C-alpha cells in the first residue's frame, strides 16, 4: 500500500464524469440532422418572443401616448422614447446610431434561477421587469439596424 491508499501497481484512471468536467465543450458524437427539428422550426417564428440571451425576453408593449410639453413654471417631464424613423426622414448629415431621435423603450423580463423546490424536485425562477433602450433605423428596400442598450 502507498500513502495515498492505492496498492502498488494499480493506478487511478480518470472516470468518464471527471473527463467530461474537464472538457465540457466536447464534440457531439452524432452528426446533425438533415431535416428540420422542432427547435429550428420555432427559431424565427413571428409570434414567439425574441430571446437575445438566456436570461432576457422581450415583452412587446403598445406604443406610448404622445408626451405633452410642460407649461411655463412646471418641471419638464421625462420624455418617453418611442421612435421608428426612416433614413429618408433624417437630414443628409452624419447620424450617430445612439441619436435620441432613433430611440424607443422596450420592456424586458430578466429571469434568474432561484432555489430548487425540494418537495416537487423542480427548479424555480424569479422574473423581474426592466426597461432597455433600443435605437432603431430603417431604410428603403427593407433594411433595418437595431442597437439595444440595457
Swiss-Prot record:
GO biological process, one term: viral transcription
Keywords: Early protein, Host nucleus, Transcription, Transcription regulation, Viral transcription
Subcellular localization(s) per the UniProt record: Host nucleus
Positions of transmembrane segments: none
Keyword Transcription: yes
The UniProt record lists the keyword Transcription regulation: yes
Region ranges (Disordered): 1-31
Sequence motif Nuclear localization signal, residues: 1-58
Coiled-coil features, chain-numbered ranges: none
One term under GO cellular component: host cell nucleus
Main localization, broad class: host cell
Family: Belongs to the adenoviridae E4-orf6/7 family.
Purpose of the protein: Modulates viral and host transcriptional activity to promote viral genome replication. Stimulates viral E2a promoter activity by binding and inducing dimerization of host E2F. During viral infection E1A protein binds to cellular retinablastoma (RB) family members and dissociates these repressors from a complex with E2F proteins. Free E2F is then bound to E4orf6/7 which leads to transactivation of viral E2 promoter, and cellular promoters such as E2F-1 promoter. Activation of cellular E2F targets promote cell cycle S phase and thereby possibly favorises viral DNA replication process.
Subunit structure: Interacts with host E2F proteins.
Protein's name according to its UniProt entry: Early 4 ORF6/7 control protein
Organism per entry: Human adenovirus C serotype 2
